């Protein structure tokens, strides 16, 4: 589950919104007993009258703490209980929060499909990341979008990485909607991944779209 909070304020010509999400997998994080180190914190601004930057968002996310590194159940000799190592997305008996090797919900938790040993488990669920996005429409015909994500990865508490691994992702997108051809638009997107978790990769997309009204 999660605790979600947001605060928005509307100015005469722009709008700002700050939001906070605190997620949990068990009682230790539900009661905030072990702090609020793992979270999603974001800030978003909308500028509808600014053609160059219509909106931008900045987010910080951490899944690194997971209630701490120590797990100890109660015993006769040591009655104190420590509920650490929550091990997000993982489970001892089944394959965890995934479907056909792809993680569900969170795009930055490394999916099991990328495991080189072909084992269906999560080898990297302790991350810290920054995400930045902006979009704009400088003219009536052209629009753009930019997404940047930078992550640091620690593996898991049970099988940590030898070093902190970095992975960065970039997306640049341009759209063109000519006035001469009503209903037609073209979008070109280029994406690049650079890092030590998923390696380096490059991809592109070209999309042509035609919209029309059947009632006319």
Can you say where each PLM-predicted feature lies in the sequence?
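Outer-membrane beta-barrel pore domains
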Residues: 2-3, 8-216
